[in-house]
């Protein structure tokens, strides 16, 4: 196990900067997931930790030792890649033990360590097979075994599940998490898949445009997104965002066509905001109910345990996720009930989170 410290790390390609002064701390034994869209710099950051990319500026330390000038093999890291990177002419056992052979480890010790890793990953019955005779999940376990046998300080995963089908991804997520609990090794996992990120991480690092948007537990990221980007990137369906203006006793939405009553927000009247609400926090009611927003149903997606209802709100797309036994027809009218306690507010200009005081206006007695 080893801690990782990243201070002011930048990466430039010619005159283009792709990673902008990243500062991060990963604790020993922690499982950290770096999440972000394609091109956000997450894999580049991982490769700089591994030593596969040079650092343009800043400093990376592993277990208290600055590794900027160290070769990849000197950093105590083992990497698992998206494409497995197995030798096709070698057996599973030979692939797992190859690094030990190169290091000159005696044959008897190699065999013992290969067997131990194979037991951990349930690969004992496959040791004589070649990679072509394995399933995608089995190949990925072999790639993990090749990393494990080196007994590294740090495991680095570069989108290792991207080539697997949906069922195998679920299975491998579980196996990776159980393996981490067993080994208690520091792990850094890069992905663009938010489900992988939320289910695997002790802590999440959300990146966008080469910068860190937010660091926190999966629960913190989901319930208190630090920016509009995080709010809409994490969560499926994405958080609904409606542009609005703060009024004395409420919120004017969609250019003034809709209004939500609120006692006060703590923001100056006239402030432009982006109001966010998670689809599962919206309650469907009959159209015309006091305090509800009327909308037109566009599409209903059945999910088995529930459904996602996509509606049109004066031209703005909006989604509702519910497990209630409601099946509105496309084109029909529904009411959307939103509690101020479930609202998130972001700056319309900067996109940063605005922490406001939210109190609903009591509905009139019927």
Curated annotation (Swiss-Prot):
GO terms for cellular component: ATP-binding cassette (ABC) transporter complex, substrate-binding subunit-containing. It is a peripheral membrane protein. Keywords: ATP-binding, Cell inner membrane, Cell membrane, Membrane, Nucleotide-binding, Sugar transport, Translocase, Transport. SUPFAM superfamilies: MOP-like, P-loop containing nucleoside triphosphate hydrolases. The keyword rRNA processing does not apply. PROSITE patterns: ABC_TRANSPORTER_1, ABC_TRANSPORTER_2, UGPC. ATP binds at residues 36-43. Its EC number is 7.6.2.10. Pfam families: ABC_tran, TOBE_2. InterPro entries: AAA+_ATPase (IPR003593), ABC_transporter-like_ATP-bd (IPR003439), ABC_transporter-like_CS (IPR017871), ABC_transpr_MalK-like (IPR015855), ABC_transpr_MalK/UgpC-like (IPR047641), Mo/tungstate-bd_C_term_dom (IPR008995), NA-bd_OB-fold (IPR012340), P-loop_NTPase (IPR027417). It catalyses: sn-glycerol 3-phosphate(out) + ATP + H2O = sn-glycerol 3-phosphate(in) + ADP + phosphate + H(+). GO terms for biological process: carbohydrate transport. GO terms for molecular function: ABC-type glycerol-3-phosphate transporter activity; ATP binding; ATP hydrolysis activity. Its main location: membrane. Part of the ABC transporter complex UgpBAEC involved in sn-glycerol-3-phosphate (G3P) import. Responsible for energy coupling to the transport system. PANTHER family: MALTODEXTRIN IMPORT ATP-BINDING PROTEIN MSMX, OSMOPROTECTIVE COMPOUNDS UPTAKE ATP-BINDING PROTEIN GGTA. Belongs to the ABC transporter superfamily. sn-glycerol-3-phosphate importer (TC 3.A.1.1.3) family. The complex is composed of two ATP-binding proteins (UgpC), two transmembrane proteins (UgpA and UgpE) and a solute-binding protein (UgpB). This is sn-glycerol-3-phosphate import ATP-binding protein UgpC. It comes from Mesorhizobium japonicum (strain LMG 29417 / CECT 9101 / MAFF 303099).
């Amino acid at each position: 196990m080893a801690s990782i410290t990243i201070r002011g790390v930048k990466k430039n390609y010619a005159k283009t900067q792709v990673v902008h002064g990243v500062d991060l701390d990963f604790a020993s034994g922690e499982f950290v997931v770096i999440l972000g869209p394609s091109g956000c710099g997450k894999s580049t950051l991982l490769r700089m930790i591994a030593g596969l990319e040079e650092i343009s500026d800043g400093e990376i330390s592993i277990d208290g030792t600055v590794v900027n000038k160290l070769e990849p093999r000197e950093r105590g890291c083992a990497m698992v890649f998206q494409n497995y990177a197995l030798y096709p002419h070698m057996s599973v056992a030979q692939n797992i033990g190859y690094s030990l052979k190169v290091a000159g480890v005696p044959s008897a010790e190699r065999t013992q360590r290969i067997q131990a890793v194979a037991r951990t990953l349930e690969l004992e019955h496959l040791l004589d097979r070649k990679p072509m005779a394995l399933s995608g999940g089995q190949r990925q376990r072999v790639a993990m075994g090749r990393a494990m046998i080196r007994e590294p300080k740090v495991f680095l995963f570069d989108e290792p599940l991207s080539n697997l089908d949906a069922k195998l991804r679920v299975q491998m997520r579980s196996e990776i998490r159980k393996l981490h609990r067993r080994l208690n090794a520091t792990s850094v996992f890069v992905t663009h898949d938010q489900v992988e990120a939320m289910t695997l991480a002790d802590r999440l690092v959300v990146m966008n445009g080469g910068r860190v948007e937010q660091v926190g537990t999966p629960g913190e990221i989901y319930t208190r997104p630090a920016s509009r980007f995080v709010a809409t990137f994490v969560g499926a369906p994405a958080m609904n965002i409606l542009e609005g203006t703060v009024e004395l006793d409420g919120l004017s939405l969609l250019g003034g066509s809709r209004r939500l009553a609120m006692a006060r927000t703590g923001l100056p009247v006239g402030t432009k905001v982006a109001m966010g609400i998670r689809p599962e926090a919206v309650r469907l009611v009959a159209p015309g109910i006091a305090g509800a927003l009327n909308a037109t149903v566009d599409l209903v997606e059945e999910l088995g345990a529930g459904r996602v209802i996509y509606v049109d709100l004066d031209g703005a797309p909006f989604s509702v996720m519910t497990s209630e036994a409601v099946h509105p027809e496309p084109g029909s009218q529904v009411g959307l009930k939103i509690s101020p306690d479930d609202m998130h507010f972001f700056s319309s200009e900067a996109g940063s989170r605005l922490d406001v005081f939210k109190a609903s206006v009591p509905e009139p007695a019927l």
